[in-house]
A protein has these predicted regions:
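Canonical Radical SAM [4Fe-4S] cluster-binding loop centered on the CxxxCxxC motif
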Residues: 1-29
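Classical nucleotidyltransferase
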Residues: 88-135
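Flexible loop residues that form catalytic
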Residues: 18, 54, 104-105
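Canonical radical SAM enzyme core domain
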Residues: 20-36, 57-94
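Hydrophobic faces of well-ordered beta-strands that scaffold small-molecule active sites
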Residues: 49, 78-80, 102
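Conserved glycine-rich "GG(E/T)P / GGGxP" loop and the immediately following alpha-helix
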Residues: 45-70, 116-118, 132
Length: 135
């Protein structure tokens, strides 16, 4: 997902190229079909679809909701990575996503012992929430 309104942006962001809203391809039916084909071709190897960027929650919510609805039809866990708190995530995201990683990257809080749901998080302020368990 391209585009991040971070103000300020995270120091040492893992993907500063994604801050620009004008890069990448627009999500549409053709793009979804490409994703669907890849997931079907590698079905036995793919357990989840992870969405990060940029900032997922700085996007057009109508387009984001449509994308999540499409992806949900692929019967894979949907992960969203956001700098925002869970309380700031839109309702449709809570309903359609299986996991939501919250918390911006804060270099001063870097750590190597924040393992949650099989994902090593970069800083101690980050948390992963699982649908049905944590929200």
């Amino acid at each position: 997902v391209a585009g991040c309104k971070g103000n300020p942006h995270c120091t040492n962001c893992h993907n500063p190229e994604s801050w620009n809203f004008d890069i990448g391809d627009l999500y549409n039916e053709v793009y979804f079909e490409k994703i669907k084909t890849k997931v079907q071709d590698f079905d036995n190897m793919i357990t989840s679809i992870q969405i990060f960027g940029g900032e997922v929650n700085d996007q057009n919510y109508i387009e984001l909701e449509n994308m999540l609805k499409d992806l949900k039809t692929l019967n894979k866990d949907i992960w969203i990575f956001t700098r925002y708190d869970l309380k700031d995530c839109p309702k449709f995201e809570l309903e359609l996503c299986d996991y939501i990683k919250c918390g911006r990257y804060v270099q001063e809080l870097s750590c190597d012992n924040n393992l949650q749901y099989g994902i090593q998080l970069a800083t101690s302020n980050q948390k992963i929430y699982k649908k049905g368990l944590d929200y």
